[in-house]
Amino acid sequence: LRRARFPHDTICLLDGGNTLCGPDDGKAKDFEKKQLKEKAKLIVESYNRMGYQSMLVGHHDITLGLEILQECEKMAKFPFLSANMRYKDDNSRVFAPTTVVECKGLKVGVLGLTIDTIPEYYLERANPDRPLVLTKAIDEAKSLIPELRSQCDILVLLSANSAETNREIAAAVPGIDVIVDPLIELGNHKVWVDEELSMEQLGETLMVRTDAQGARLGTLDIDWIDGGRPMVSLSFDSAPPAGRSTYWYERASMEPHLLEDPDIMGLVEAFRKGSAFVNIDALPELPHKDKYLTASTCSMCHVEQTDFWKGTTHADAFASLVETGDQWRQDCIACHVLGYGQAFIAPEEAEPYKNVQCENCHGLNPGHPQDPVNHPWGAVKETSCLTCHNKNQTRIDFVFSRERRKVACPPLKRN
């Protein structure tokens, strides 16, 4: 952000949503939600310090419940936007639909549209006492954009809808200068956006996309001339026609070598230290704890397989979290231990379950040690791996046939 601000007096900093919660946070158990809530508040406070000016409400942002999201909104020094998220009972809006931001003498109007194809049950679960609905994004755009256009110089639409819907909006509603499309792909979440998909000219509207999960920061540098629509890209035309506004769009990678901001890291370290605290008295019972054998039990008979396992990355999975101080984060730990939330919760009970062990891959089979003939282990299934090795978790493709060979134990010698 400092690099983006350096050549400019000011920037307009916007977020495309699905920021505060992850896609699986709605499945979190009660004891996990407190930490996930603190993580969401950490993100909001970080955004406050970075100077964000608005954030679209994405459908993942309500997975911990509307009440928690509204607590975060009260903390924020910037508006949460969604023109089409409404209460079902009276059709009133839950969040502000628009905002106008002053940016270097220009007024930037921002309209937020949440993806409008989310199932009704998901919205009801987010606020059971007063269920939510999502109206059609294109209808809200048609209703609100003419008035917003009269209040601003540049009009930006934050729309977490499908590319097809965003194209329909651009074609049907004149006056939109920029659509920021967070590229939502339900069922097949895509983290990296190909270069040819990062920009799209839709008549007089420019649609831009950047990568998910904070992988890259999209920056749109506009040299605005009143009446100079449509804008011309300097990457294609170094000598644009007179009187036309110009833009330059690029995505800056969030590389590991970038210096960490001490103020933000102070917030992160405080969160990490607090993540190790678990109220023992408030923990639920763990009725399935006795079903877990752990690798120590398996090692008594399967010596060769245990020796092989110790040389794999699975055997050091917990240590990789310790290196970053994230070992007690509830959104990380489950993929680095055995049986989190089923066999143990409290840190002081974690020792036998650390690392990715036999049962992470093979499943539970508590009767095997006493009667291996009648309780054999089945083959490892790809679905066991995909619980953790998916793009939401790792940002990379997982090829089961290739990766399995790296961790597959030597075959047993049968008598």
Regions found by a protein language model. Give the residues of each.
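Short sequence/structural segments immediately N-terminal
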Residues: 60-61, 229-232, 236-415
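Acidic, metal/ion-coordinating pockets
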Residues: 1-251
